[in-house]
Every structure is written in structure tokens, then in C-alpha cells.
Amino acid sequence: MILQEGLPLLYQQFTALFGKNLLLSWRNKRATCLQIFSSFFFILLIFCIEEAMKASDASSSAYKNITDPTLLVSPPILPCEDKFFVKLPCYDFVWSGNNSRRVTDIVSAIMANNPGRPIPTNKVQSFKEPDEVDTWLLSHPLQVPGALHFVERNASVISYGVQTNSSSESKRGQTEDPTFKFLVPLQVAAEREIARSLLGDPNFGWGLGFKEFARPAIITETTSALSVMGPVFFLAFSMFGFVLQLGALVTEKELKLRQAMTMMGVYDSAYWLSWLTWEGILTLVSSLFLVLFGMIFRFDFFLKNSFVLVFLLFLLFQFNMIGLAFALSSIISKSSSATTVGFLVFLIGFITQFVSATGFPYSSSYAVSRRVMWSLFPPNTFSAGLKLLLDATSTPKSSGISWSNRAVCEGGQATCVISINIIYQWLLGTFLFWFVLAIYFDNIIPNASGVRKPIFYFLAPGYWTGKGGNKVEEGSIFSCVGSVPLVEHNTPNDKDVLEEETEVKQQAMDGIADPNIAVQIHGLAKTYPGTTKLGCCKCTKTSPFHAVKGLWMNIAKDQLFCLLGPNGAGKTTTISCLTGINPVTGGDALIYGDSIRSSVGISNIRKMIGVCPQFDILWDALSSEQHLHLFASIKGLPPASIKSTAEKLLADVKLTGAAKVRAGSYSGGMKRRLSVAVALIGDPKLVFLDEPTTGMDPITRRHVWDIIQESKKGRAIILTTHSMEEADILSDRIGIMAKGRLRCIGTSIRLKSRFGTGFVATVSFIENKNDNNIGVGASHEPLKKFFKEHLKVEPTEENKAFMTFVIPHDKENLLTGFFEELQNRESEFGISDIQLGLATLEEVFLNIARQAELESATAEGNMVTLELASGISLEIPVGARFVGIPDTENAENPSGVMVEVYWQQDGSGSMCISGHSSEMRVPQNVPVTRPPSPNALGHKSLRQGVRGIVIDL
């Protein structure tokens, strides 16, 4: 199949990624509608605020035509509780002059004759002198609206004074007028009762009325709600798209979705252009709706200014925010942080809006450098543009800014440093700045795995030409702690591994490019640097971790190479290095001649590989059919063949019935099948399958095995798995890693013959219905004796139906004659069938893993406790097989006794003790290393736990 390249591939990837963005937005309708139509709610809110301001003004008499003012007749003294912000307990009024009997009677009459409400005596305070009143007022603020001061001059003259707080207060939009509310009622009451007292007629009528002059309504140029609240609301509206865009980009990075596309060969240019185009369309639509809604609600800002000018301001500003979101997404690694950063950007923009409103720094009094730095933050330039357009429509007589006057300075100045035309130029320039910076950051800032390009990667000719993939580049490894220490290379202990390493080194030295070799690994090493943590009064530093320690290996075409190993062996790290996910610390690997340490090389490699990662990397909102169409387009399949290829792969992995179901609804096994199909799309030359059948049912697993077997032709496959059956059936060669090193390599039969315990003989018996009461041992004792006499072995498993024996390799020369005799005596022993085979691959795997654990435990001192049946506790290294018991030497056992320890892997993949044999004699002439012990330990002290003796047999 011929794949597309160059510009046709770029266009195909762009359209596929654009379609993906469109589909994801469609399936997240709520967020998309919010981004497009949120402007309506902001405009509506501004409109409601402005109408409320107009209604508040209309309720005031100052803004009404008064032709016949209302007459106010004898207003009463109000309760003190009616005063705004009064403190309790309060008093309706206080008075001075209580040394005069006549004055006291006048005040009593004021209280009794108050219109509509007599004033209780406990609501009035009396004093002798005005100074006493002042003193009381100072010590009791806001507890009384006013005071009356009386002086009896003579029998016909009584003078008085009114004292009130002339400060007006506002509450809930209403202003309190102390003159008409408190002063006038006190004055009217005092004059009325003084007149009655002087005339001696308590029924003397005293009526007083007053009204304001007739006048027209006051016409003022009130401040528009849009001019006050608009800049903040417009910024908040634009932040919806910014936060959603930033969150989407960071989520794709966090969930490794972009990494999956990168491994399949997506162009960075196609990725960024697809996002820019889609977000640009959303921005254009949302900006258009904002302006239209503003015109519908009849705001002068939108009606008087040129439609194009207003639309361009919002459009270019939101484009700037897209560029800023791109740049920030290269730095942020967690989607949870994206919302926080978005709020922080809004908060900073909110603050700088007020600074920009003062004219800073867009005036000739500020240096150009300040304007440049200030304008790099998009909300600042946006605020300046809003100010120009708002000022142009600030009064009813203002005509706004037309398109032809866009370059004219504010106020008709001959020269200025800012105009709406200059604002547009700034917005265009800063968008390009942020967009280019985003692409640069995306290449040089290390991702979660530490991969980056050199700082001046764009100066390398290969970056533009795509050539030079076999040249190793510096700068592809990043570490925040400086240089990473390399592990020392050790000569392999295994002869097959040494032979493989020697062959690869010789080919590299001779410059031989074997066309039958797909992958050639040259001393691959990966070390994770230690970390430093500052705690309370101490600094904790961890040592570097060597995940892969010098791997040399060839992987041939048309073969499946299976890489086995316990958890932490380095399998997934090796695959991550080969696919370019993780940078290598040392060594290199050539995949069809391209180096994984070259950015050009890894780009070429990704065009010819397929990857099924250890953990599924899928979009929950996309179906399996849509996944395959997307990755087929990224790979460069001809458009005409994409549909048929996807249908075939879905049929191969039995997902045809669920082709249109979203992946988020799939089970774990279905997701793994989809990941396998994605890895095989585009006819890759090299396929990485990292535990591909995890979570599958047995029937589906067998079916996927058939697919993998059929896929070997014309390509190399690298498989990792924890299923020994899967490795045994599928692999042409097997390599077992442990502790970062390759421990053995070869075919399954080769490994079984070298590292297995021997041959496994299974003898099945003829069913005998008459021996129900005969024990197993009694019925098969002759056969057990036959094996014991000839091969010196005991059964490892036995029951009525069969018996299993493990025969050591050193008995191989006896097997031909032994089994000929056994076949001749089948009827004597009641045998129905005899099977002979090698040890299982699982046994080989456990032996290799156990030996690696023993080496590590011996070097690092990792010990576990072995509890013997006798109650003795022994401290033994992890992985030790034969362990001698100290101080058990006697005449019968001159070398002491030992036990064989059985090991297995626990749920986490770590080695743990599963049991041990009975005590047996230590063979003579076997060198042993005794544990350090200052004193001879008796049997009693063994119960307290001592170090066992490792015996190498």
C-alpha cells in the first residue's frame, strides 16, 4: 500500500484532525453553546443594569417636569428608627432648657401634639444647657436625629434653636435629606407650641405648608452601564473560549492522546493548524453574535461605531487569546491546572483594565519599550481599543468611529501613539508572537517523559528537509539535575546474550546494514535521575534509577520478538525509548536505518511503526470506526481505502457490531482490541504490542493471536506480555529482561532446554472402577519405584488419573532406553498414555527472575524471612534457591542440612516465597559462605532469626 507524503498528507491529517475537533465539540454541545452564545447573557445583563439605572433616575423628582409641586403641610416628627443607620437605643429628639418650667411645658406639648403619633417620654432626653447636649451627642453618635435648644428671655419672649446633622446618607438607592426629614418638623413643632404658650390658647391653630418651585426636569449626560461594566463583561465573555481551549489542549496532552497521534506520525503543523482553524471559526461566530446582540439591544457602542471596527476588535482579541492558550498549554501538564491558570489570566486582565483606563502607557509621556511590554498581554491592548470606541460614543452627540477614520487620533490630534488602527496592528502582531512562541515551546520544553528538541532545532537543515535521520543529535535528553550518571557496562553472564551483543557490535563496527534486520539496538540505556526534596530542616535526595542497562540486540523482519520480564524489568521503558516517547540516556537504536536519537530519525520512524501501548489511549467520545478513520488518515492511507481498511480491521478484532458505539462505553477487553487494530493500521513495518491481550476473554484472545500470527509477514513485531502461553505460541524469539538487563535470548525451545529444570514426563492411567478403595500410593507404587530405580526421581504431582515427574537434564542419555522399557510394560503399570516435554516457559521465566533478584539482593542486602516447619526463622536474600541452615553439621550430615526455597510472583510482580522443601543433606564438596557470627549460635537462638547460607548447586 502506497501511503501519502508531503503536502497531500499534511492536508489529509489537517482535515482528519479538524473533523475530530468538530465531532468532539458537537458531542460536548453544552460547552460549545456556552462559548458561542454566552455573549447574549452578558449583553442582557448590561442591558438590565442600564435599565435599572434609568429607572432609579426616573424615580427622583429632579429628573421630572414639576408644574404643580405638592404641598407638604405640618410634617410630623418621625420616629428615630426611620433615620438611616441609627444606633439603638435611639431618641426622637433631645432638648435643653429644662431649668424653665414654661419650656418644660412647651416640650410636653410638642410630644403630646405631634401629628399622627404622640411621642413617648422615653424617646426624649432633656438637658439644662446646650453644652451638655453637645457632650451627650459626642458620646452617643447616631442615636438621635436632632435637638431643640430653648431660652426663656422674659414673659413675652422665648427663643429657640434647631440642631441637626446636615450630612445626607444613602441606603438602597435612596438619599436621606436631613433638612426636610428632621429639621423642618422640629422647627414647625417648636414654633407652634411657643405661639400657643405665649397666647395662652392651647387650641390656637397653627398651619404651615411648603412646596418647591415649579421647574423643568434636569437633563444630564448620565454614565452608561456599558461604559462602566462593558470592559469587564467583554473580558469575561472572551475567557470562556480561552479556558475551554486551554483545557482541551492540556487534556489531550495529559491523557497522552497527542502522544498517541505523534507516535502514529502526525505532523505538528497539521495538529496546530487544525486547532487554530476550529477555534478560529468558533471565535468568528461568537464575535459576530456578540456584536449582533449588542445592536439588538440598541447600545450606542455597537450602533454608532463601525460594525467592522467593533467586530474586528473582538475577533482579533479572541485570536490573541487562542495564541496565548497554545503557549500556556506547552507549559501546563495537568488539566486541573488549566482552569486555575484561566482564572488567573482573567484576574490579571481585570486589574490591568483599570490601569489601561488611566491612559498608561499609551501616551507620548511613556517610553515605547513600556508600550511594547504592556501590549504583549492581550487584555491590555483590548482594553485600550475598548476605551477608544467607548469614548467615541460617550455622549448623545458623539458619532462614533467610522471605518474611514480608523487611523485618526482621538480628539482629532495631529499625532498620537494610539488609534484603533494601531490597536489592530498590535493585536495581529501579538497573535503571531504567541502562536510562534507556542510552537517553539512545544518543541523545546520537555514533556512528561523528558523528550525535547535542541534549543536551535529550527536551524538544522534536516528539520526542514526530513533528511539525516541516521545522525545522532544532542539535546534530545533533558534532566533538571544536570548530567545523569551512566551505569557501567558489564559483560553478560549468559553465552547467548554475549553472542548476540558481540554480533551487533561487530555489525556496527563494520558498518553492515543487514536488510533483514528491522531493529538494531546499540547499548541502549535509560536512567531516571534522582530527585531532591527539601523538608523541614533536611534535604532528601534519591539515587538515580537505571531502568535499562546497556541493551544490545537485533530484531529481524518477518519475526515476532517477545520481550518478557517481571514488573520493573525495563520492558515498557525499552519500547518507550524505541518509539521516541522517552529519551535515551545512553546508546542508540536504528530502526530501518534511522536513529531514535535524531529528531529527523524519530519522525521517519513514526511513519513506519504501529503502537499498541500498555494502557489504552482513546477518546471516550469517539467510536471505534472514527478512531480507525482518524489514525488511517494520520498514517496517510489513500482516502478511497480508509473505509474498507477500517471495516476489515474491525472485523478482524470482532468489533464490527460495536463500530459506531463510543469507546467510553467499551469494556477493557474491547478497548484493547481497538488498540490492536489501531496499531496494525497503515501497514506498518514495525509493530509494538505492549501487553495487547490484557483483559480479553479466552476466545477473543485466541482470535487476536491468529491476527498477530498473520501480521508477521513483511514486518517485525515486538511483543511484551505477562502470559507465558501467549509468548510460547506467538514468538519466534524470546528475550527475558530483569533489573534492566537482558538475561537470556533465543527460541522458546532453546530457553526451556537451557534454563528449565529438565524434562516433564506425564503418565496417564487406565481407569479402573474396581480400585475405588485402594489408595493412590498403593495402586501406582510399582511405577514410582520404576522411576526411582532408573532415574532417581520422585513424582511432583500424582492422583488416580495421572502422575508427573521432572527429569533432570543430566539424565537425558538414559531416556531412550528408559521409555522403551516403560512402553513395553504399559499394561503391567496400567498406563494409557505417556507424554514427554520440556519444562514450561513460566518455569524458565521464574528461574531467570529469581536469579536476577538474587544478584540484586546480594548486592543491596535485600532480605526476607523464611519460616521453616521446625520454627526456625532464616534471613535469606530474595531469590535464593538452596539455603543452608547454620550450625546443623553433625556426623551424619558433615556439611549440614539445607532446604530448597520455592518462589513465585505476587500480584504486583515481586518475588515472594511460596514454600520450601523438607530438610535435606548438603552435598559434600560444595563451597558455602557462612554468615558473620561473633558467637556460636545454638538451636534455641535460631528461632530468633539468623542469616541463612546461600548454596549454589
Curated annotation (Swiss-Prot):
Which Pfam families has this protein been placed in? Answer: ABC2_membrane_3, ABC_tran, ABCA11_C
- Keyword entries, A-Z: ATP-binding, Membrane, Nucleotide-binding, Transmembrane, Transmembrane helix, Transport
* Source species, domain of life: Eukaryota
What SUPFAM superfamilies has UniProt attached to this entry? P-loop containing nucleoside triphosphate hydrolases
Q: Where in the cell is it found?
A: Membrane
Q: Which residues bind ATP?
A: G565, P566, N567, G568, A569, G570, K571, T572
Membrane-spanning segments: 33-53, 230-250, 277-297, 307-327, 341-361, 417-437
InterPro entries, per this entry? AAA+_ATPase, ABC2_TM, ABC_transporter-like_ATP-bd, ABC_transporter-like_CS, ABCA, ABCA2/9/11_C, P-loop_NTPase
Domain named ABC transporter is located at: 519-764
Q: Which PROSITE patterns match?
A: ABC_TRANSPORTER_1 (PS00211), ABC_TRANSPORTER_2 (PS50893)
How is this protein annotated for GO cellular component? membrane
Question: What terms describe the molecular function in GO for this protein?
Answer: ABC-type transporter activity; ATP binding; ATP hydrolysis activity
Q: How does it sit in the membrane?
A: Multi-pass membrane protein
Q: Which PANTHER family match?
A: ABC TRANSPORTER A FAMILY MEMBER 11-RELATED, ATP-BINDING CASSETTE TRANSPORTER SUBFAMILY A ABCA
Name the family.
Belongs to the ABC transporter superfamily. ABCA family. CPR flippase (TC 3.A.1.211) subfamily.
Q: What is the protein name for this chain? A: ABC transporter A family member 11
